[in-house]
């Protein structure tokens, strides 16, 4: 993940009140006390987005209201790669 993208995503997280930390190519996002999400990372030449342990595009956590900003950014980011 390039530094500019990492900084942008981290800034979006902070604006929405989330805590972030960068670990290698993974931006960990903590939206609440008990839940830690992986905002963006690369897995086998593709982008993954979702829960840090599943790297999935589905599930109840992915559709939560507090996570809408990340879904919208993911759509824009994927569209740029098409």
Describe each model-derived feature in a short phrase.
Residues 65-82:
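Surface-exposed beta-loop interaction hotspot
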Residues 58-66:
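Short alpha-helix boundary/capping segments
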Residues 6, 45-48, 63-64:
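Broad hydrophobic/π-residue packing in well-ordered secondary structure
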Residues 1-42:
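N-terminal "first-domain core" detector
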Residues 32-59, 77:
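Short aromatic-glycine-(Arg/Gly/Cys) micro-motifs in beta-strand/loop hairpins
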């Amino acid at each position: 993940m390039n530094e500019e993208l990492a900084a942008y995503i981290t800034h979006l997280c902070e604006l929405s009140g989330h805590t972030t930390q960068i670990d290698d190519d993974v931006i960990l996002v903590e939206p609440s006390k008990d839940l830690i999400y992986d905002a963006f990372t690369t897995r086998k030449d593709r982008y993954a987005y979702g829960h840090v342990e599943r790297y999935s595009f589905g599930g109840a956590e992915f559709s939560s209201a507090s996570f809408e900003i990340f879904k919208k950014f993911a759509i824009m980011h994927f569209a740029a790669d098409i």
